[in-house]
Amino acid sequence: MNTLYYSFMMSFLKENHPEILKSIDKIYEPDLSKISKVIDCYCKFAGIPIQQIVGEYINYSDIQHRYKAIAVVLRIFQPEKFTNLKTKVKSTIYKELGPCLKINNDILQKSIICACNQFDLYRDFKMEIKQIANYYLIDARFNKDY
């Protein structure tokens, strides 16, 4: 699904069927084995290769992509984390996300804190994360590749 088509579809839903978007916002994915697919979906949506956000040392300009990818994962697998920042991230998310991004738990924990803070502070960041999460959920629902 290309992003232009997706944006038209989202505009149509927002204008004509806002209740559908509200119900999508309440969906979360219980299968944590799909975390790598969410990361792949984020990279596809952002138009970047996954190697850009993987590894201990990445370019400073790519760090925002890592934070956004982590925020999308949290939005899909543990959305309550964004309503209460004191909620602990599920240990199974750490176990899946760390190897997927090829980073240790310390860097992952700091990245999660940064992603949550940006989600809390910046409206544009929050809107983009919700948009990408909705893109994944819709794409996963209609394309059984995910």
Where do the PLM segments sit?
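Short acidic DE-rich linear segments
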Residues: 3, 137-146
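Residue-level detector of well-ordered alpha-helical segments, enriched
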Residues: 34, 38, 66-69, 107
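Short, solvent-exposed secondary-structure capping/transition elements
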Residues: 79-87, 108-109, 118-125
